[in-house]
Amino acid sequence: MAGLKRKFNKGHAFTSKCVSLVKEQRARLYILRRCATMLCCWYIHGDE
């Protein structure tokens, strides 16, 4: 029974680590998308 609990805890730690990495990557992509949009808008509307 204790061995099963250890495996569950390991799996849970792995899952929570994956979730935190996914959240971090989503935040980075959001920032990059915002920056790219801003730069495109400045490039398009900069001549006016």
Curated annotation (Swiss-Prot):
User: Residue ranges of region Required for DVL/RTFL small polypeptide activity?
Assistant: 13-44
Q: Key word Membrane present in the record?
A: yes
| Entry GO CC | plasma membrane
TM segment ranges: 25-42
One Pfam family, short name: DVL
Keyword vocabulary terms for this entry: Cell membrane, Developmental protein, Membrane, Transmembrane, Transmembrane helix
Identify the InterPro entries for this entry: DVL (IPR012552), DVL_RTFL_regulatory (IPR051525)
Q: What is its main location?
A: membrane
Cell compartments where the protein resides: Cell membrane
Q: Which GO terms describe its biological process?
A: negative regulation of cell population proliferation; shoot system development
**Topology relative to the membrane, per the entry?**
Single-pass membrane protein
**Family note:** Belongs to the DVL/RTFL small polypeptides family.
Q: What does this protein do?
A: Small polypeptide acting as a regulatory molecule which coordinates cellular responses required for differentiation, growth and development, probably by restricting polar cell proliferation in lateral organs and coordinating socket cell recruitment and differentiation at trichome sites.
Which PANTHER family does the protein's record reference? DVL19-RELATED-RELATED
Q: What is this protein called?
A: Small polypeptide DEVIL 19
Gene behind the chain:
DVL19
